[in-house]
Amino acid sequence: MENISSALLDWFYKNHRILPFRTDPSPYHVWLSEIMLQQTRVSAALPYYERFLAALPDIPALAACEEEKLHKLWEGLGYYSRVRNLQKAARIVCEQYGGQLPADYDALRALPGIGDYTAGAVASISFGIPVPAVDGNVLRVFSRLYNDPAAVTEPAVKKAFTARVMEHQPPDAPGDYNQALMELGALVCVPNGAPLCEKCPLAHLCAARAAGTALELPRKAAPLSLIHI
């Protein structure tokens, strides 16, 4: 398959949503946004994001925040382990990195509450490090692009898809590329209902569109059956 990055980035620069953590993609802002957007829609998270940053504008402020105030700022978002891990990580960053997130994928990945995806997002978007940031949107795009019926919830399959993602990533714009894939999955190659193929910059390359199988993808692993003895 020909490289997708040029067509994808052209589309992204013309069609991406204007979001505060894109306008100012500093490491703290990107990290906070990615944690808030876990299990929460963008439209719902934005007021919390802006209020949180107004109260705690940097990592040292987050590290020093009293628990009651911290939970009040998070109230309504749910999944409170997210904000507890945010503060744990902030305190480690203050102790070990002078209050600034490290410009290193592995160091980011080692912080509480930061998994492969969030580490990749911060590293690529804020620091320009050529690493993947693969979420459900990206897996869906690549499952359809290659018309691949493999179950994306399987670790080995996700690893193979991640390798494909990296084959197309331009070394000079890893953050924009990662965001473009996420945006394409969120706005065009949507999970529920028919994908908006007529608006997709990759439609001419999409194997699932050609085969008429886009609605069947991505596939997830079948649940294990219980055997009663």
Residues covered by each model-derived region:
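An aromatic/glycine/proline-enriched structural segment found at the starts
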Residues: 221-222
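Conserved small/polar residues in nucleotide/adenosyl-binding loops
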Residues: 227-229
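Catalytic cores of DNA base-excision repair glycosylases
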Residues: 2, 6-7, 11-198, 202-211, ...
